[in-house]
Amino acid sequence: MGRVSGLVPSRFLTLLAHLVVVITLFWSRDSNIQACLPLTFTPEEYDKQDIQLVAALSVTLGLFAVELAGFLSGVSMFNSTQSLISIGAHCSASVALSFFIFERWECTTYWYIFVFCSALPAVTEMALFVTVFGLKKKPF
């Protein structure tokens, strides 16, 4: 159990790091929205890109809620497979989203980061919910 106990704080810290970067992106999304648009754009085009990015970030926050609920309730806290998936995904997301903010990547890039770094661990977390509560099996 010694190796698993080291995964718990690592998972929590990478999850929070990813959450902080997503919240930072909410605050500073203007430069990324402008990077998605041509040099001359209309306010309608700007608003459309803004709504798309806000929707993507909102879905990401919803998936954070799912993952934090599973983690903090203990459903997946000591599951080493879920911990490794979560650590890898959220660590990658923290780095990739930092580049997304500072390098002003296009908005379509966010969807790739979203699928591999937010949706994947959330789907595996929901599978653990089904396993634990639906099938009444131990999570580890």
UniProtKB/Swiss-Prot annotation:
The keyword Transmembrane applies. It holds the Pfam family TMEM107. Its main location: membrane. Glycans are attached at N79. It is found in: Membrane; Cell projection, Cilium. The keyword Transmembrane applies. One of its GO terms (biological process) is regulation of gene expression. Keywords: Cell projection, Ciliopathy, Cilium biogenesis/degradation, Developmental protein, Disease variant, Glycoprotein, Meckel syndrome, Membrane, Transmembrane, Transmembrane helix. It is a multi-pass membrane protein. GO terms for cellular component: ciliary transition zone; membrane; MKS complex. The chain crosses the membrane at residues 7-27, 53-73, 83-103, 113-133. InterPro entries: TMEM107 (IPR029248). Part of the tectonic-like complex (also named B9 complex). Interacts with TMEM237, TMEM231, MKS1 and TMEM216. It is linked to Meckel syndrome 13: A form of Meckel syndrome, a disorder characterized by a combination of renal cysts and variably associated features including developmental anomalies of the central nervous system (typically encephalocele), hepatic ductal dysplasia and cysts, and polydactyly. Orofaciodigital syndrome 16: A form of orofaciodigital syndrome, a group of heterogeneous disorders characterized by malformations of the oral cavity, face and digits, and associated phenotypic abnormalities that lead to the delineation of various subtypes. OFD16 features include postaxial polydactyly of the hands and feet, multiple tongue cysts, and dysmorphic features, including frontal narrowing, short palpebral fissures, flat nasal bridge, retrognathia, and low-set ears. Neurologic features include delayed psychomotor development and severe cognitive impairment. Plays a role in cilia formation and embryonic patterning. Requires for normal Sonic hedgehog (Shh) signaling in the neural tube and acts in combination with GLI2 and GLI3 to pattern ventral and intermediate neuronal cell types. During ciliogenesis regulates the ciliary transition zone localization of some MKS complex proteins. This is Transmembrane protein 107. It comes from Homo sapiens.
